[in-house]
């Protein structure tokens, strides 16, 4: 029990005195987004991406719909991000989330399809 208390006290001290990330180095986030078929609809999973303002975002896009040879689009118009993803040919998009808000993720090839949302927190 004393060992556990000592370890917890040590962790508390480390946490209390740990400083923030060095100034000038933006946070980064990398995530894989996969296009799948679910109940007859093609969707990007995960459908919601949440980051803090100022984060450098890298998204690897994979079209994983085996029954559909078509291309699928991935676009975040609020950030001028767009890619066309063929099955078996992953694409990568990068941008800095420099505006707070909620931004729709759409398929620019099929405008009626909304694929999710990018949530950028202050």
Task: List PLM regions with ranges.
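Bacterial N-terminal signal peptides
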Residues: 6-16
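Sec/Tat signal peptide C-region and signal peptidase I cleavage site
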Residues: 17-23
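Extracellular/periplasmic metallocenter environments
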Residues: 24-28, 85-122
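Beta-strand-rich interaction surfaces with strong enrichment in secreted/lumenal proteins
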Residues: 46-49, 80-84, 93-94
